[in-house]
Amino acid sequence: MNSDKAMKGVERAPHRSLFKALGFIDEEMDRPLIGIANSYSELIPGHMNLDKIVKAVKDGIRMAGGVPVEFGTIGVCDGISMNHKGMSYSLPSRQIIADSVEIVAKAHALDGLVLVPNCDKVVPGMLMAAGRVNIPSIVISGGPMLSGRTNGRVTDLNSVFEAVGAVSAGKMSLEELAELENTACPTCGSCSGMFTANSMNCLSEVLGLALPYNGTIPAVFSERLRLAKKAGMKIVELVQKDIRPSDILTEAAFMNAVAMDMALGGSTNSLLHLPAIAYECDVDINFDKINEISEKIPHVCKLSPAGFHHIEDLHMAGGIPAVVNGIIKKGLLNGECMTVTGKTLYENVKDAKIKNIDVIRIDNPYSETGGLSVLRGNLAPDGAIVKKAAVAPEMMQHTGPARVFNSEEEVSKAILGGKINPGDVVVIRYEGPKGGPGMKEMLSPTASLAGMGLDKSVALITDGRFSGATRGASIGHVSPEAAEGGPIGLVEEGDTIEIDIEKKTINLLVPEEKLKNRKPEKVEKPVKGYLNTYRQGVSSACTGAVFHSTKE
């Protein structure tokens, strides 16, 4: 076993002495040493139950004959860090999570890893670590929050963000906002729509690194604890059979994940995270492949923010296995990929049934193409991402005057100050991976537009990114970013921008000769500490905003 490096032989007597200081007995040193990466936090609603998940995982490991050892990782709540400087640290935290899991696993010669994430950057960060470390690994997440009930209406966190705009527009009272604030997030768990955390937790099933139903069992269900025990038992089996992430996280598995992302209408952030995870596994996911898959895969689920259903509805309708089974039967997924169950993807789901055809619409899809698209044009030569599943029909084609801002803070003031008009195209730049730095999410601006009733008449484009809760004609990840000399840095107030989501184009309607004579506005955003380190090392959003320095 890998742990023999730290436990076996005469020269390892000092090492064994330290293990015995931890309370180990000799018999435990002959068993698989399983690390549990626990991102428990009292700052993140989606992570406040992970102590219970980890206890169940430990029970499962011990039942199967392994020895569990728990260690901590950091995490950021994107909702709490939204719309202030804190959001600059969200995406950078993904790198630190991946690095920290790698460091602990390698430094202590672990035999296997149980990864216990739940929220936005923690799931991909841990999956990146699994690909990089490549010892037997399994993911067991904390589970989704239940949706709220506010005066008879089903609500979620996005309802509260949009309500801020509604209050500013005089469409909602402060009393109504307070009622919503108190009821929209009723339990622990990852926020209840098909937002980023739930998108990635669902895709971890499809990638094959999590057990079936990992993405949809609500955080407060006892079923979640039972799944955690099974994950603990399964990791010991994976170690014994030497089944590693490299056996599971293949190119075919990633293509399956992209396809399911399209079928589910997942978060735009998933198209930042999947390439980053693939990078650690030496698999290339580029925007051309993503668009090719998008053209073939029907959009079969429409959860919040695109629709009215939530993750608990998807779970009750049959969960990810039911969706996967339906898509495989249409010949659109590779069912032969290996998974942590030791079985193929199809073997995992072949008996899963759709229990609610209003939630999972395999035979009556919302559209014949996927819920996410990559746009290209002279404004985004390397691509930009839109969640077309959450775009109103009247905004699928839009042409309007540019309203240019160099930070999220500037645009938020303009929106809430009533300075954005129907027909405008809001441009937020210098918020990319390097320019921000940190590539902040723009949920507050998009939610404010929606709450003010402008989501069906105003488009928003940015070299930053969006929350999975964002809806409307919100186009992010514009690449190259302004800080790297991208054309978005040349846009001037009043320029005409043309967007055609169906044709996958985004163009600045300014003559090429005129653009050549423009110089980008110089925007300095000095930072220190980790953000400065991040700015120097991070790559473009179109390649997953990874650190190329992690490769030889």
Swiss-Prot record:
GO molecular function: 2 iron, 2 sulfur cluster binding; dihydroxy-acid dehydratase activity; magnesium ion binding
Pathway this chain belongs to: Amino-acid biosynthesis; L-isoleucine biosynthesis; L-isoleucine from 2-oxobutanoate: step 3/4; Amino-acid biosynthesis; L-valine biosynthesis; L-valine from pyruvate: step 3/4
Assembly with partners or alone: Homodimer.
HAMAP family (UniProt xref): IlvD
GO annotations of cellular component type: cytosol
Modified residues annotated as N6-carboxylysine in this record: K121
Organism: Clostridium acetobutylicum (strain ATCC 824 / DSM 792 / JCM 1419 / IAM 19013 / LMG 5710 / NBRC 13948 / NRRL B-527 / VKM B-1787 / 2291 / W)
Record: residues binding [2Fe-2S] cluster: C119, C191
InterPro entries: Dihydro-acid_dehy_C (IPR042096), DihydroxyA_deHydtase (IPR004404), DiOHA_6PGluconate_deHydtase_CS (IPR020558), ILV_EDD_C (IPR056740), ILV_EDD_N (IPR000581), IlvD/EDD_N (IPR037237)
Protein name (Swiss-Prot/TrEMBL): Dihydroxy-acid dehydratase
Textual note on the cofactor: Binds 1 [2Fe-2S] cluster per subunit. This cluster acts as a Lewis acid cofactor.
Record Pfam families: ILV_EDD_C, ILVD_EDD_N
Enzyme class label: lyase
Active-site residues per Swiss-Prot or TrEMBL entry: S467 (proton acceptor)
UniProt GO BP: isoleucine biosynthetic process; L-valine biosynthetic process
Cofactor(s), names only, from the UniProt record: [2Fe-2S] cluster; Mg(2+)
Keywords of the record: 2Fe-2S, Amino-acid biosynthesis, Branched-chain amino acid biosynthesis, Iron, Iron-sulfur, Lyase, Magnesium, Metal-binding
Listed EC numbers: 4.2.1.9
Protein task: Functions in the biosynthesis of branched-chain amino acids. Catalyzes the dehydration of (2R,3R)-2,3-dihydroxy-3-methylpentanoate (2,3-dihydroxy-3-methylvalerate) into 2-oxo-3-methylpentanoate (2-oxo-3-methylvalerate) and of (2R)-2,3-dihydroxy-3-methylbutanoate (2,3-dihydroxyisovalerate) into 2-oxo-3-methylbutanoate (2-oxoisovalerate), the penultimate precursor to L-isoleucine and L-valine, respectively.
Domain of life of the source: Bacteria
Residues that bind Mg(2+): D78, D120, K121, E441
Reactions accelerated catalytically: (2R)-2,3-dihydroxy-3-methylbutanoate = 3-methyl-2-oxobutanoate + H2O; (2R,3R)-2,3-dihydroxy-3-methylpentanoate = (S)-3-methyl-2-oxopentanoate + H2O
Protein family (similarity comment): Belongs to the IlvD/Edd family.
